[in-house]
């Protein structure tokens, strides 16, 4: 009976070690935006953090407004009968918000370039780190 307990404990320990080591083979730790990224100096890290914080502060209100307009747009489409003039007006507002967000992104990219921060490869084709078709906007 004692021998069977030891065998069971050894098997459980080996199983736990095997399950814990699988993350080593899964290329963990990269995350989005880390593919082929050059290591940043401490000055670049500080500059990147400031640029990122500034961009977030400027863009978060616009992003929230865009989400609200999407809900409004969908509600107008679901109305019976749909009011095309209201739908077109909300669509135009959404386009203006997207344009404002794009302008902020360009300003952020310019600030990063001026700070000497490499842009990296981004999310890649399909929106998931460089491969496949199952990313953002693909079903």
Curated annotation (Swiss-Prot):
<comment type="function">
    <text>Part of the Zra signaling pathway, an envelope stress response (ESR) system composed of the periplasmic accessory protein ZraP, the histidine kinase ZraS and the transcriptional regulator ZraR. The ZraPSR system contributes to antibiotic resistance and is important for membrane integrity in the presence of membrane-targeting biocides. ZraP acts as a modulator which has both a regulatory and a chaperone function. The zinc-bound form of ZraP modulates the response of the ZraPSR system by inhibiting the expression of the zra genes, probably by interacting with ZraS.</text>
</comment>
<dbReference type="GO" id="GO:0042597">
    <property type="term" value="C:periplasmic space"/>
</dbReference>
<keyword id="KW-0346">Stress response</keyword>
<comment type="similarity">
    <text>Belongs to the ZraP family.</text>
</comment>
<dbReference type="Pfam" id="PF13801">
    <property type="entry name" value="Metal_resist"/>
</dbReference>
<keyword id="KW-0574">Periplasm</keyword>
<dbReference type="InterPro" id="IPR025961">
    <property type="entry name" value="Metal_resist"/>
</dbReference>
<feature type="signal peptide">
    <location>
        <begin position="1"/>
        <end position="26"/>
    </location>
</feature>
<protein>
    <recommendedName>
        <fullName>Signaling pathway modulator ZraP</fullName>
    </recommendedName>
</protein>
<keyword id="KW-0732">Signal</keyword>
<keyword id="KW-0862">Zinc</keyword>
